[in-house]
A protein has these predicted regions:
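Class I S-adenosyl-L-methionine-dependent methyltransferase catalytic core
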Residues: 1-219
């Protein structure tokens, strides 16, 4: 059973009690809100020209995410979840897509990206800055590009993407605790974030605030 402390993460929800329907915004137009992609994307996310996502790696992991968000998992299998991801990307129609994946979900996510973009590049990466923790970043682009992400830790890769890739705005519809938000904020870029877990989003909001971000809240 998930502990109450685990559900609340670091307790940022007490300071940033984001609720359904609220939008947290920065002066540059960056926004964060609660959303479940199986029910649809926030409209502002569709304005992004770049996407970075790190989706659940399996049906079991996905179910655990919903449990932590105190919600019922609405999909019957992982392929159905991937179909929702693809639909969201099609609605956004970005110039560039970056999808972090693992051994368990790579076989579903690579074909998905290949069906959406004419140019696909796969970087081999690590996570937690541990050489034995392997992951991949699948890059989909409209033109052939190499952003030098091979061999990087995924944390560093996200900061490099936000610093070097010439996008106007980036969205992460699995924002979680806000790695993309932090990287985009540091790079002076606009970001759009959403997640179904309000406690995780509160952590993201807090981390950006600690970097100097000043949030306003609207309904």
């Amino acid at each position: 059973m998930t502990s109450q402390k685990g559900l609340r993460y670091d307790g940022s929800i007490d300071k940033y009690p984001i609720t359904e329907g609220e939008i947290y915004s920065l002066g540059n137009g960056s926004k964060i809100t609660i959303a479940d992609i199986t029910l649809g994307l926030p409209e502002f996310s569709k304005n992004a020209d770049c996407v970075f996502i790190d989706p659940a790696g399996s049906k079991g992991v996905l179910k655990a995410y919903y449990t932590k968000a105190e919600k019922q998992c609405p999909v019957d299998n992982f392929d159905e979840f991937v179909a929702h991801i693809k639909r969201c990307i099609e609605q956004i129609n970005p110039d560039r897509l970056f999808v972090e994946c693992f051994y368990r979900n790579k076989k579903q996510l690579v074909p998905m990206v290949e069906s959406l973009f004419p140019h696909v590049k796969i970087y081999e990466n690590t996570y937690y800055h541990k050489p034995d923790c392997k992951c991949w970043i699948i890059q989909g682009t409209k033109q052939a590009e190499d952003w030098g992400l091979q061999g990087m830790d995924e944390w560093d890769a996200v900061f490099k993407i936000c610093k070097d890739v010439p996008f106007c705005s980036i969205t992460d519809f699995f924002m979680g605790q806000g790695l993309v938000a932090q990287a985009a904020y540091d790079a002076g870029k606009v970001f759009y974030g959403s997640d179904m877990n309000r406690n995780r989003l509160a952590v993201a909001i807090s981390k950006v605030a600690k970097r100097g971000g000043e949030w306003t809240v609207t309904k």
